[in-house]
A protein has these predicted regions:
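Short S/T/G/P-rich N-terminal loop/turn motif that feeds into the first structured element of a domain
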Residues: 1-49, 53-69, 76-97
């Protein structure tokens, strides 16, 4: 069963432009994951949210250490704070109907 990790982040200096966010994602080594997808979106001037979709809970758990290291670096580099995080199995998905 696919597994999702949702997060919300606070940017003290404001959320960067889409191009800057894409550059941050590329810099963070997005290719260094087995996630099926990583999606970031802006919700206001100082917050963005993200969704990571993994093939399974086991794989999400195996990548937890890598995620934590990347988050610590991102916090230091971008002056951001994790506001909330939720994880769980994906119960339904339109693309799989």
């Amino acid at each position: 069963m696919k597994f999702a990790v949702y997060t919300k982040w606070y940017w003290k200096n404001g959320v960067p432009t889409p191009a800057e966010l894409q550059a941050n994602m590329n810099k963070a080594g997005s290719g260094d994951t087995t996630a099926e997808d990583v999606i970031w979106w802006k919700i206001d001037e100082n917050h963005h949210q993200s969704l990571i979709i993994y093939p399974s809970e086991k794989i999400a758990e195996e990548e937890l250490g890598k995620r934590q290291v990347k988050r610590e670096k991102s916090r230091a580099d971008n002056n951001i704070e994790l506001v909330e995080e939720f994880m769980g199995p994906i119960m339904s998905r339109l693309t799989e109907l």
